Amino acid sequence: MDEEIDTRKINNSFLRDHNYATEADIISTVEFNPTGELLATGDKGGRVVVFQREQESKSQPHRRGEYNVYSTFQSHEPEFDYLKSLEIEEKINKIRWLPRQNAAYFPLSTNDKTVKLWKISERDKRPEGYNLKDEEGRIRDPTTITTLRVPVLRPMDLMVEATPRRIFSNAHTYHINSISVNSDYETYMSTDDLRINLWNLEITNRSFNIVDIKPANMEELTEVITAAEFHPNQCNTFVYSSSKGSIRLCDMRTSALCDNHSKLFEEPEDPSNRSFFSEIISSISDVKFSHSGRYLMTRDYLTVKVWDINMESKPLETYQVHDYLRSKLCSLYENDCIFDKFECVWNGTDSVLMTGSYNNFFRMFDRNTKRDVTLEASRENSKPRAILKPRKVCIGGKRRKDEISVDSLDFSKKILHTAWHPNENIIAVAATNNLYIFQDKVN
């Protein structure tokens, strides 16, 4: 990341775009695979679209950062729970990738109730010359077979297939909000509002409940789990966040049921800032370990915070994402925007944070220089390979030509889901039904 973050040049291209978005087309999750060669999106229609990065060519070196559609498949279908008389949406809540072990790719996808492990593989050859079947696959008349043939493989057009390998279901009473693959690559956890389950990737009919915060009397319920993630290299450690603004770090070596946390990260509330909305805006919508495992990043409604896992008392850093909305919390409560769940991501070196905002704005914070920038992902000012200009929001009556008034912000345009390439300065931003890819300008 360049030090001059607010003047850095960024190329962009949008890959998936419709003039008129239907509810099913709205992107609900974005995730790079561990190498960054693939990028997956899930939408409210239960579909997963996988993009593959262009291979570098000497004739067109500028195309190296571009991603093209690699595979599209229907991951989840709408279902109905007849016992509870509830519809189960097909919306993809999260996608996570397993590290590549062979020629195939293995993503995990989940809706509210069911997690699926998919295998994405390529075929560029097909068998020919069977003895008992013709080329169309029909059984041949044995009386017409006069010679014994040896089947051979013939080249064919490349075909990418997505097939479900495992289906993990019937383990969650409440809606799944996150999944996280363990660093042992043998297990993963799925999290709903009140419980966290640990699964073995090879076993679909049994999971272990490792966190259960459901009270005996549901009237005594005071908080719910909002997100959870495994430590990047300690397979026994994970964290989960709550709607009360706390983060709990748990060690599975201490007990099978991790209801008693090892560490509790919580910032004391400032009594002078106490208001009707305090509890709502302090709810954590996302928690992410840094790649090094030393830090935690959390996102609440107005801020991004960085925590040192060795210091529980207060965050190491606090970044204001859109503090200008503090005076508008009442109207944001009335239109339900105050309950929006924004995600946050680290760059590959843990030096820059990124998260979304309204009006199709997204924010970047450089931890080293303490500089920040607001950028916009929109069709109006984003043509392929265009350079993004920083945007500014003003609160007062007077505003400059390049500024936008807080009263002019479009709260229906919001960036909730973002992803950062694990090794390079390439980011993916989901704006309603559009997917934008941005990268540092090379020349």
Curated annotation (Swiss-Prot):
A Gene Ontology term for the protein's cellular component = cytoplasm
SUPFAM superfamilies named in the record? WD40 repeat-like (SSF50978)
What InterPro entries does the annotation carry? PP2A_PR55 (IPR000009), PP2A_PR55_CS (IPR018067), WD40/YVTN_repeat-like_dom_sf (IPR015943), WD40_repeat_dom_sf (IPR036322), WD40_rpt (IPR001680)
Q: Which SMART domains match?
A: WD40 (SM00320)
Principal cellular location given in the protein's record: cytoplasm
Q: Name one GO molecular function term.
A: protein phosphatase regulator activity
Q: Where in the cell is it found?
A: Cytoplasm; Cytoplasm, Cytoskeleton; Membrane
Give the UniProt keywords, A-Z: Cytoplasm, Cytoskeleton, Membrane, Repeat, WD repeat
Report the Pfam families cross-referenced here: WD40
Q: Where are the WD repeats?
A: 22-61, 87-128, 171-209, 220-260, 279-317, 334-375, 410-443
Domain of life per record: Eukaryota
This molecule's function is given as: The B regulatory subunit might modulate substrate selectivity and catalytic activity, and might also direct the localization of the catalytic enzyme to a particular subcellular compartment.
Q: Share what the entry says about its subunit structure, partners included.
A: PP2A consists of a common heterodimeric core enzyme, composed of a 36 kDa catalytic subunit (subunit C) and a 65 kDa constant regulatory subunit (PR65 or subunit A), that associates with a variety of regulatory subunits.
Could you say which protein family the record assigns here? Belongs to the phosphatase 2A regulatory subunit B family.
Stated name of the protein = Serine/threonine-protein phosphatase 2A 55 kDa regulatory subunit B beta isoform
Origin species:
Carassius auratus
